[in-house]
């Protein structure tokens, strides 16, 4: 019974994936479908049509290689001009002091951030130890290890206490059932009368 259910769920997932891919192809721009070779769509930055130099009369989809390469039009060069956006004078009022301080300090150099105050340089550089070896010498000095040990010890202690309580409870229950003296026996012993001759 589980195998048909799994097959049904797999089929349902495949149908949903196929429907989603069909939906994605329907959202393509219809004006690009005439001039696209091999699924090559223009970038968002492109200006104008995908192939402005080709008209529907000149372009035959059967003559192309499918790679988007148009061999008949390789020698033609088309230049497009891109309007550069005007640089706006964007500033925050009251932020001029910080801008002026930043220009004076010049803390950025070749994409590297230089601290404002230089760290003091010691005369003997050979005594410096790398940060990897300055880790705590003992594993028990690390806070993560101590936290894990304390939590593990608490859980282990609780487990041991519950185990002992369970054993004591079972022993008491067993003892109560076998040594109960207040119960009357199920059968009565027949009286033995001895007759002396």
Curated annotation (Swiss-Prot):
Pfam families referenced in this protein's UniProt entry, alphabetically: Syndecan
Query: What does the entry report about post-translational modification of this chain?
Result: O-glycosylated; contains both chondroitin sulfate and heparan sulfate. Ser-38, Ser-65 and Ser-67 can all be modified by either chondroitin sulfate or heparan sulfate, and the protein exists in forms that contain only chondroitin sulfate, only heparan sulfate and both chondroitin sulfate and heparan sulfate.
Say where the protein is mainly found: membrane
Top-rank taxon, per record: Eukaryota
Q: Which residues are glycosylated?
A: 38, 65, 67, 124, 136
SMART domains attached to this UniProt entry: 4.1m
**Any one Gene Ontology BP term:** activation of GTPase activity
Record's keyword terms, sorted: Glycoprotein, Heparan sulfate, Membrane, Proteoglycan, Signal, Transmembrane, Transmembrane helix
Where does the record say this protein resides? Answer: Membrane
Role according to the record: Cell surface proteoglycan which regulates exosome biogenesis in concert with SDCBP and PDCD6IP.
Q: Which family does it belong to?
A: Belongs to the syndecan proteoglycan family.
What do we know about how this protein assembles, alone or with others?
Interacts with SDOS.
Q: Could you tell me what this protein is called?
A: Syndecan-4
Q: What would be the name of the gene that encodes this protein? A: SDC4
């Amino acid at each position: 019974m589980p195998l048909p259910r799994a097959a049904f769920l797999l089929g349902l997932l495949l149908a949903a994936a196929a429907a989603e891919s069909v939906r994605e192809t329907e959202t393509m721009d219809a004006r690009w479908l005439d001039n696209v070779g091999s699924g090559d769509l223009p970038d968002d930055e492109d200006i104008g049509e995908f192939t402005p130099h080709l008209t529907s009369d000149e372009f035959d989809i059967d003559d192309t290689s499918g790679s988007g390469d148009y061999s008949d039009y390789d020698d033609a060069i088309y230049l497009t001009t891109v309007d550069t956006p005007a640089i706006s004078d964007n500033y925050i009022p009251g932020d001029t002091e910080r801008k002026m301080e930043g220009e004076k300090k010049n803390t950025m150099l070749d994409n590297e951030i230089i601290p404002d105050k230089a760290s003091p340089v010691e005369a003997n550089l050979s005594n410096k130890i790398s940060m990897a070896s300055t880790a705590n010498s003992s594993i028990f000095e690390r806070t993560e290890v101590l936290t894990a040990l304390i939590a593990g010890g608490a859980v282990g202690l609780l487990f041991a206490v519950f185990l002992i309580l369970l054993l004591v409870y079972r022993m008491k229950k067993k003892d109560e059932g076998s040594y109960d003296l207040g119960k009357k026996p199920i059968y009565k012993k027949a009286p033995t009368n001895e007759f002396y001759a």
